[in-house]
């Protein structure tokens, strides 16, 4: 069991301005800090992109959650709104990769992701906490977005300890009470765990953790001019975290032609048909489901 002492917990909402659950949870906690009180834990909440939240837009000029590459944080010539805001957050929460703070970044998605923890590293502390949360709520899934030899650019990468919470499905720009409450419960369960760690206790954990390891992203079918040529197949829509086998339908073209998954092994797609990913050329992320032993 990793015995890190957590100096402070930072909860970030509104990294994307049209994801309102995180924003309004942060506002709720800031209005009544006693909701987060734990005797051995200091917790602070902040809004990641206040201007985007004010305008109810994902971002002003570029995606804040892709602005945390270290070279970009050190490059003061980068002057777009979110690039500047990333530097502000880095000054508050950095240096990047520190292990003193624990960071929770709150997100929501139009995809049928349920309750998902997104890990951006293999730190044992994060894996243990993820196992604790999945043990207390089997509906929670764990997605590990790590790629070999590629630095992560997410807000949550500012700290070694922590992760993003992604909940859905929910349309952009609105609140859903059920997902709001489920996210709030996850936050409280996380703080309960961290409080135990700071007291020197070792919360009981399962011996294994099921996680979904990132493999690759898949784009939509496109024309030779780069225009959209199809959409998610009806048989795949909403089936996040369900197995996709070679030969299964994956896309339907505008001419009603079914395109089939041509991979050589079973994968588990997630973020299927996420609205914000159209501009990124991402129809879904493919993952591999695996059980890992906890040390």
Swiss-Prot record:
Known catalysed reaction(s)? an N-acyl-L-aspartate + H2O = a carboxylate + L-aspartate
UniProt-annotated binding residues for substrate: 58, 65-66, 166, 277
Q: Which Gene3D superfamilies match?
A: 2.20.25.160, Zn peptidases
GO cellular component terms attached to this protein's record: cytosol
Write the protein's name.
Probable aspartoacylase
Q: What is its EC number?
A: 3.5.1.15
UniProt GO molecular function: aspartoacylase activity; hydrolase activity, acting on ester bonds; zinc ion binding
Q: Name one Pfam family in it.
A: AstE_AspA_hybrid
- Reported cofactor(s): Zn(2+)
Q: How is the cofactor bound?
A: Binds 1 zinc ion per subunit.
Q: Which family does it belong to?
A: Belongs to the AspA/AstE family. Aspartoacylase subfamily.
| UniProtKB keywords | Hydrolase, Metal-binding, Zinc
Binding positions (Zn(2+)): 16, 19, 107
Read off the NCBIfam families from this record. Answer: PRK02259.1
């Amino acid at each position: 069991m990793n015995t890190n002492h957590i100096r402070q917990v930072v909860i970030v909402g509104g990294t994307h301005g049209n994801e309102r659950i995180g924003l309004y949870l942060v506002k709720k906690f800031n209005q009544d800090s006693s909701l987060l009180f734990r005797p051995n834990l200091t917790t602070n909440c902040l809004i990641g992109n206040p201007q985007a939240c004010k305008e109810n837009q994902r971002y002003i000029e570029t995606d804040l959650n892709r602005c945390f590459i270290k070279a970009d944080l050190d490059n003061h010539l980068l002057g777009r709104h979110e690039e500047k805001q990333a530097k502000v957050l880095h000054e508050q929460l950095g240096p990047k990769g520190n292990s003193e703070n624990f960071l929770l970044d709150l997100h929501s998605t139009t995809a049928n992701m349920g309750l998902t923890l997104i890990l951006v590293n293999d730190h044992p502390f994060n894996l243990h906490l993820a196992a604790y949360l999945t043990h207390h709520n089997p509906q929670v899934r764990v997605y590990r977005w790590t790629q070999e030899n590629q630095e992560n650019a997410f807000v949550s990468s500012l700290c070694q300890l922590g992760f993003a919470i992604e909940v859905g499905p929910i349309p952009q720009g609105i609140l859903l009470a059920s997902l709001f409450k489920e996210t709030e419960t996850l936050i409280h369960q996380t703080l309960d765990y961290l409080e135990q760690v700071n007291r020197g206790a070792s919360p009981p954990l399962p011996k294994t953790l099921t996680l979904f390891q990132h493999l690759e992203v898949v784009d939509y079918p496109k024309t030779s001019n780069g225009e959209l040529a199809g959409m998610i197949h009806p048989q795949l829509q909403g089936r996040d975290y369900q197995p996709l086998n070679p030969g299964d339908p994956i896309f339907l073209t505008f001419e009603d032609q079914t395109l089939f998954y041509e991979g050589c092994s079973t994968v588990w797609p997630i973020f299927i048909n996420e609205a914000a990913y159209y501009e990124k050329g991402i129809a879904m992320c493919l993952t591999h489901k695996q059980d890992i032993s906890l040390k």
